[in-house]
């Protein structure tokens, strides 16, 4: 990795092992994402659907009411911010990997189920719906 002026160059080393040489593209994309994240924050948008489901931001934490007896609190790591609007949760930050990890942890709290479609899903995620017992019995 070389920095010349305002440009960063990632060049494969001479005579290095093939395993190290194969990581060249990985390092290039990691550095590129770090630079891109500083200028434009990365964000993931999650939507939730279900009876009584709601979310609220409390400081740097996110409180989710997902039909359990107690609300679920997701701690926001340093550099991650939450924005809640109606049934949308926006996770944003400068670290692409951390934004994706936090969004996955939120989704894990109540994955979308295929019969009614209730749960937490990514905004553009398509949930394949299944026919229920009544629909399956009527078709038979």
What residue spans do the PLM features occupy?
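Ribosome-associated RNA-binding proteins
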Residues: 1-140
């Amino acid at each position: 990795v070389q920095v010349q002026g305002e440009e960063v160059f990632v060049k494969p080393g001479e005579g290095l092992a093939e395993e190290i040489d194969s990581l060249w593209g990985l390092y290039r994309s990691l550095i590129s994402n770090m630079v891109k994240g500083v200028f434009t924050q990365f964000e993931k948008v999650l939507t939730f659907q279900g009876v009584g489901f709601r979310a609220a931001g409390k400081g740097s934490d996110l409180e989710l009411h997902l039909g359990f007896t107690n609300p679920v609190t997701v701690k926001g790591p340093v550099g991650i911010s939450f924005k809640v609007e109606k049934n949308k949760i926006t996770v944003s930050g400068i670290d692409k990997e951390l934004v994706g990890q936090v969004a996955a942890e939120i989704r894990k709290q109540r994955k979308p189920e295929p019969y009614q479609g209730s749960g937490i899903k990514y905004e553009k995620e398509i949930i394949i719906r299944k026919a229920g017992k009544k629909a399956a019995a009527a078709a038979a």
